[in-house]
Amino acid sequence: MTKDMTTGSITPLLVNFTIPLVLGNLFQLTYNAVDSIIVGKFVGEDALAAVGTSNPQKTLAILFINGMCLGAGILVSTAFGAGDNKLVERQVSTTAIAGTVFSLAFSLVCILLANPLLRLLQVPEEILPIAVNYLRIVFAGLIFTFFYNFLAATMRALGDSKSALYFLMVSSVLNIAGDLFFVEVLGWGSEGCALSTVLSEAACCALCLVYIRWKIPVLQLGRRWLVFDSSLLKKTVSYGWASAMQQATVQLGKIAVQAIVNTMGVNAMAAFTASSRIDDFAYIPQQNIGHAATTLMAQNRGAGKKDRVRKGFFCGLKIEAVYAVCITILCYFCAEPIIRLFADQPEVVELGVRFLRLVSLFYLMPALTNGVQGGFRGLGDLKITLNSSMLNMAGRVAAAAVFVLILHMDIEALPYSYAVGWVLMLLYEVPALVRCLKDGTL
């Protein structure tokens, strides 16, 4: 199933496309949260801290791969909007081949570097072996991560955001069931949790391939899956690399912040892990609203419909703002019962509540930055998204280092450092946006 987003009322199109993306990520975040709950309740605080301190490295690898898929998806959207199905086919097959080779090599490198990377980040010795084993199992399954993200990004580029949601829901249920079986029944601890993640992603890939074979004619390539168009590779790598680096830059900043948190003790680490799981409910849906606007804008850019490109951008910003207000209210007033889902120790709960309430007050800023970034991706200008993300992370890490390591502030230093990064990001993005509006690019 595909959806032409170059015709029809823009607001319903964007809302209907956005809802499955947001639901999919909320569902994924829910099972990630359940993941942490199962580890925390059935294995213990050390295992929860180990999984939490491993999560930024795992997410870095996943987001780097996802960024490549997102960049390639922009090219697919543009070709589909222009009505060039042959170009769509060649773009998809070329990305699949190049991505497979890269993912296998990347997986091997990540497995080899898991231990030295965690040591570099000052992970405490008592949880280091747990964290290393968890990461290596997850990294071994990166080929499944690539194929799911690639197929899902391609379906979204063609206007189908619902199918990926259904497959993700099935995968999430399988992951939770696997967690309970491997962790509670077999007693495999955090390693069982990691294995469940890999197996559920493999199942999700299989479901996507079966669906594409039966329901999406433009992707029924058969032997044409083996077609490699070297003329498309340079642009694909350019878009994919810029998008991957933007995603990776954000995660590298989070890893640097995690390293600073690791100096604050196990209680702060556990509180930060629990709070960050909930914090993701704000950021990731905001990113997906931006991705929805990117798809609509890219399709209409390919079709040469500049007026719809502009309207799609501003509609995306409105949706971002509404979501930010809703999640701010929820996280601020329900902080304590939410944190208690992850931990029982009073010290951990108290630190987590303080973090979550403070950071929720700033949620409107990332909503605006994600909306603007979605717009620039839709225009094909990935350099601005990369530069602004680098500025954001540099400001965040520098502020966190000053607040924690020099001024010796406690966990509340982290939300303030986030705000510093977002302010710098807006100071860079807003003038660039104004220039695009004035010169007619947008």
Q: Language-model segments: which ranges?
A:
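Short alpha-helical transmembrane segments in multi-pass integral membrane proteins
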Residues: M1-T18, V76-G141, V185-W241, M297-F362, ...
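N-terminal transmembrane alpha-helices
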Residues: M5-V43, T59-G71, L75, T100-S107, ...
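Transmembrane helical elements of multi-pass membrane transporters/channels
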Residues: N16-D35, I137, Y148, S171, ...
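Helix-terminus/linker motif at the lipid-water interface of multi-pass membrane proteins
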Residues: L26, T30-A49, L118-E125, F181-W188, ...
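Alpha-helical transmembrane segments and their lipid-water interface positions
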Residues: Q28, N32-V39, I62-C69, G73, ...
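Small-residue hotspots at the loop-to-helix junctions and early N-terminal turns
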Residues: V43-P56, A131, L135, A194, ...
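Small-residue-rich hydrophobic transmembrane alpha-helices
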Residues: L48-L108, T145-A164, A271-A335, P366-G380, ...
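Short runs within selected transmembrane alpha-helices of multi-pass transporters and secretion channels
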Residues: C69, I137-R156, A164-S172, C193-C208, ...
